[in-house]
Amino acid sequence: MNRGNVGGGLIVGGGRGKTTQMASFLCEGGQIVPTDQPPCPVRTRPAIVYRDCLSRGTVQKADPLDVQRDIEELHKAFKSADDNVITDILSRRTNDQRQVIAKAYQEKYNTNLHEELKVDLSEQYRKAVSGLLEDPFIFLAKHVRHTLKSSALTHKDVALLEILYPLEPQEVDAIVQAYREEYDHNLEEEIEKEMSGVFKGILVRLVTGKRSTHRKVDVPQRNKDLEYLRNNTEERLQSADDNVIFRFLVLLKSVYNRTGFYADQLHMAIKDISSGSEDRLMRIVISRSEIDLENIKDFFQSAYSHTLTDFVYDDTSGDYRNLLLRLVGM
């Protein structure tokens, strides 16, 4: 099988044997980073260090932040189901600032902001606003939970890898902890119980921290990866259907180019009418909006000759569309 370019970036091909060789880096999370690049300055978002020193988010901190004005405007907006005001405020605040607003709202009105979302708003819009109000790792933990428990997904292992594998090890650890706190269950045990498929073993290694955090690829690590692949994955990859193989190749792109991977994921989510595509679109836009969504937009336009804004506008509607467009940055 030869798919050629995936999203105009990583070139993959050469049949299933070549696929399994490329997969060697995925097995233990080896990251390929040019050795001649200077180290990136440390950037944190709750205690997470990111790989990309030139990452640019679309959502910036509001300065100054007028918390009292925000909660009063939100209170009136929820009473009248004014989605324009809700969107205008929450899409222009960082997650940390939204947490401050939510706490102040609770203290003043004795009501949780999530409860206020029960007003006459569309379902997708409510889900998106609720996601904005969540702690970032609880938000992703809920998407992990939905993937695990979904009866509509045919390849849960690949869908779950698409959420977890591109993240930093510290982020995965934070999601595992958030999952435990939110659902009182161990994510490793849940994967063992709920999952099947080609990549179940890789998922278990991922959530238990048994992945390399080294950025440079060396021969011993490569050989170790290949040995793990031969023993655990290669035979099952040979019998996997083309859809799984193609999605796996797209996933491999996150090893080389995380920005390109997310651009491809957004393109697939917008073009795909299958179950879960809308959630994928929402998850990526919200979770990357403060990190590198501006970079993803640039790559998207380069790869697909259209802006992400145009794609979102054409594929969504109403209050949900307006919120996503604000987050994407019109």
Outline where the language-model segments fall.
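Structural signature for extended repeat/solenoid scaffolds and their inter-repeat hinge/linker regions
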Residues: N2-M330
